[in-house]
From Swiss-Prot:
Pfam families: Fe_bilin_red. It comes from Gloeobacter violaceus (strain ATCC 29082 / PCC 7421). Catalyzes the two-electron reduction of biliverdin IX-alpha at the C15 methine bridge. It catalyses: 15,16-dihydrobiliverdin + oxidized 2[4Fe-4S]-[ferredoxin] = biliverdin IXalpha + reduced 2[4Fe-4S]-[ferredoxin] + 2 H(+). GO terms for biological process: phytochromobilin biosynthetic process. PANTHER family: PHYTOCHROMOBILIN:FERREDOXIN OXIDOREDUCTASE, CHLOROPLASTIC (PTHR34557:SF1). InterPro entries: DiHydbiliverdin_OxRdtase, Ferredoxin-dep_bilin_Rdtase. This is 15,16-dihydrobiliverdin:ferredoxin oxidoreductase. Its EC number is 1.3.7.2. The gene is pebA.
Length: 244
């Protein structure tokens, strides 16, 4: 269901940036699970370029039972842009969950006006798709914006209206990146480094997909995937908190 979304992202990245592959730790780039009624595969890609220090995306194909496309794009540390976050999930034929967002690293008014306010027009344009629902796993006060596109919808809407919204969100993100002024001060850059590390730690500690990975591929593999690939700058709680 979400293959066109993956392919569109790949095409945009390849045509716009000088991509270099980043090594994914052994055994984490591809895996097959025979649990359940049919096999499920997970495959990941990871790249870098001068403007974007880490581009990662993952596709889970469980046939009619599960289709998941997840991506996070981290700007280079000399840019203070939000991260681009994509979560598209389908379980069965009727359960489709969509989350598209520019995930802010900071919450001050100037930052939000510069990077988040431009999203308003898209959120309003796709108000027929977006929903104001309780987001159990998405804290609007931490790394999520008030203009994120969050929706539970049907397959027809995903293929039509949601895909159009997705393309527009990506286009806006590329525009913000193209117009962003690189940081020159070492202290400012260190602030970005810390903010991106904090994002990884926050996300790894709360990632709602951890249980999904464990159910298909086992707990040990899921923990490696979480801390060695998805959020590699995070420290596992057992390591980061002595005495636990």
């Amino acid at each position: 269901m979400y293959r066109p979304f993956l392919e569109h992202l790949q095409q945009k990245l390849q045509s716009s940036f000088d991509l270099q592959s980043l090594t994914i730790p052994a055994g984490l780039d591809y895996r097959i699970s025979e649990r359940g009624r049919e096999s499920t595969t997970i495959r990941s890609w990871c790249y870098t370029c001068s403007e974007l220090r880490k581009i990662r995306y993952t596709y889970i194909d469980g046939g009619e039972h599960a289709q998941v496309f997840n991506s996070v794009i981290y700007p280079a540390h000399r840019y203070d842009l939000p991260l681009l976050g994509i979560d598209l999930l389908a379980f069965g034929k009727k359960k489709n969950l969509i989350v598209l967002d520019f995930q802010p690293l900071f919450r001050d008014k100037a930052y939000l006006a510069r990077y988040i306010e431009p999203m308003r027009i898209l959120r309003e344009r796709y108000g027929d798709v977006a929903q104001d629902v309780e987001m159990k796993f998405y804290d609007a006060n931490q790394y999520f914006s008030k203009y994120l596109l969050f929706a539970r919808t049907d397959a027809e809407t995903v293929a039509g209206r949601v895909f159009t919204a997705y393309c527009d969100y990506l286009d806006l993100y590329w525009q913000l990146l193209a117009s962003a002024a690189p940081l020159g001060d070492a202290q400012d850059i260190r602030r970005i480094v810390k903010a991106q590390k904090d994002y990884d730690q926050y996300s790894a500690d709360r990632d709602p997909a951890s249980g999904l990975f464990s159910s298909y591929f086992g707990h040990e593999w899921a923990e490696r995937f979480l801390y060695e690939f998805l959020f590699e700058d995070a420290v596992p709680l057992a390591v980061g908190q002595p005495g636990r």
